[in-house]
């Protein structure tokens, strides 16, 4: 989600353009929950949006850490590449936070439709 549903590339210089595309998030949630409903608990479905937010924050931290430690882990295009990635992931996480109610509603709708289908 942090990659596929982001409205921009992960290294877009205009970080403020980063954000979650709810249509793509819906497609992901639909497919994921449909295939895992038999094993998925309601609590897990209810935290699907939060898990996407957490992953965006975690990756922002990893990009920033790599930048501060001299760009040893991630392949970079230039000396600010990981810093640019950090900013995009933070902007994505902020947008997810703003849209969390919608993300939760999407996951809940999918859960309700598929919890007994398996």
Question: Which residue stretches match the model-derived regions?
Answer:
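Sparse, context-dependent recognition of short Cys/His-centered cofactor- or disulfide-binding micro-motifs
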Residues: 33, 49, 78-81
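All-alpha amphipathic helical-bundle segments outside canonical DNA-binding/catalytic cores
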Residues: 40-52
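ATP/Mg2+ or Mg2+-diphosphate-binding catalytic cores
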Residues: 58-118
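Short charge-dense sequence patches
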Residues: 14-15, 44, 113-116
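Active-site activation/catalytic loop segments of kinase-like enzymes and analogous catalytic loops
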Residues: 1-39, 54-74
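Short, structured coil/loop segments at alpha-helix boundaries
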Residues: 38-41, 104
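General structural signal for secondary-structure boundaries
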Residues: 21, 41-42, 97-100
């Amino acid at each position: 989600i942090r990659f596929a549903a982001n409205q921009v590339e992960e290294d877009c210089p205009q970080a403020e353009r980063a954000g979650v595309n709810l249509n793509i998030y819906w497609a992901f949630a639909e497919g994921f929950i449909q295939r895992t409903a038999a094993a998925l608990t309601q609590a897990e479905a209810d935290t699907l949006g939060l898990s996407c937010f957490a992953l965006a924050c975690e990756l922002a931290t990893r990009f920033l850490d790599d930048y501060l430690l001299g760009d040893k882990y991630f392949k970079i295009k230039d000396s600010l590449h990981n810093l640019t990635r950090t900013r995009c992931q933070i902007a994505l996480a902020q947008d997810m936070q703003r849209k969390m109610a919608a993300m939760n509603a999407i996951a809940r709708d999918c859960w309700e439709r598929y919890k007994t289908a398996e």
